[in-house]
Regions:
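Long, contiguous secondary-structure blocks with strong helical propensity
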Residues: 51-52, 56, 109
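Generic recognition of long tandem-repeat/solenoid scaffolds
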Residues: 45-51, 88-90
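Amphipathic, hydrophobic secondary-structure cores in small proteins
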Residues: 51, 60-63, 67-79
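Long, contiguous binding/interaction regions
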Residues: 2-45, 72, 94-112
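Short, conserved charged micro-motifs
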Residues: 55-61, 95-100
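Short, compact, well-ordered microdomains
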Residues: 76, 80-104
Length: 112
């Protein structure tokens, strides 16, 4: 086993990594973000969510909390110029995409 593999966290949410207050906020943010999503794109290693520009701060706060319980997910928040939409990308190593598909309820295949 390589040193990198030995340091990988398991593909499982660790909600114990957050306080009760953080979990409540995480749940609220997740619900609000899901309601804000304009489009979901399936990527080879994960998913991309198109959000209105006003959702960037909410997305950033969500990522900060999500990283506590799911450190194996790679996050990218892209803010377009001129107040354009923002994109939240969730990707990761092998197995992360299927984990995200199940956790986010994306059971149907999306067009690549």
């Amino acid at each position: 086993m390589t040193k990198e593999k030995a340091n990988e966290s398991p593909l499982a949410c660790n909600l114990g990594a957050m306080t009760v207050k953080q979990r409540e906020r995480h749940r609220t943010l997740g619900r609000e973000l899901r309601e804000s999503v304009a489009e979901i794109r399936e990527l080879p290693e994960g998913f991309e969510f198109l959000l209105p520009s006003k959702a960037w701060a909410m997305a950033a706060e969500f990522v900060a909390l999500e990283r506590l319980c799911c450190p194996f997910v790679r996050f990218r928040l892209d803010l377009k110029e001129e107040g354009g939409p923002c994109r939240l990308t969730l990707t990761g190593r092998e197995g992360v995409k299927e984990f995200l598909r199940l956790e986010l309820g994306l059971t149907a295949r999306l067009p690549l």
